[in-house]
């Protein structure tokens, strides 16, 4: 059996491949794991794509998850295309809709023992670029569900957009994988700490990308309530 350490995430994550070429992911567990597994099972039953299936627990107490083939992004050196951003936001909407009837009562999540509020659903809570899976530049799924727990869908969307949309023209963003990116920016390494003064250059195209992402993630009946 071949194994490969996967950097990032919560640490201690390995991809193992058996003699038949089947890849699996081994990850450390915690007190929140049963609640996360129940969520993933619910999403699978609802037919949501782009979610790793839970395959069990190994003899060392690690969870065994389906491996989602593709590549992940490093926000410091990678960028996603506008098309991938819109697809990710659309997937986020489908996820929230699939999770809406998952009401586990008071459950232990990574954030502590919590119960869903009336206006809450179980959110991913960490849908940044680094947890996207891309195939040929296209959004294909979301990984690292350890921080899932009660929240508001708008907060998941805000996190996704904060991670995926450039905040100002001075950000030096790399060439996106798989398509165009708004606003256009020179190839290089991004540095969010340099975003001390906003620039209006590129705002129109950036706003359009953000609007497409918001529309993809927001049910039509709620769009009229979106500011602006």
Kindly give the residue locations of the regions a language model identified.
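Conserved HxN/HPN-centered segment at the entrance to the catalytic loop
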Residues: 44-57
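ATP/Mg2+ or Mg2+-diphosphate-binding catalytic cores
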Residues: 208-228
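Active-site acidic catalytic loop and adjacent metal/ATP-binding pocket
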Residues: 12-18, 54, 112-156
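ATP-binding glycine-rich loop module of kinase domains
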Residues: 2-41, 66, 72-77
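Conserved kinase catalytic-core helix
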Residues: 75-108, 120-125, 130-135, 185
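Active-site activation/catalytic loop segments of kinase-like enzymes and analogous catalytic loops
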Residues: 157-189, 205-213
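Protein kinase-like catalytic domain
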Residues: 44, 96-100, 165
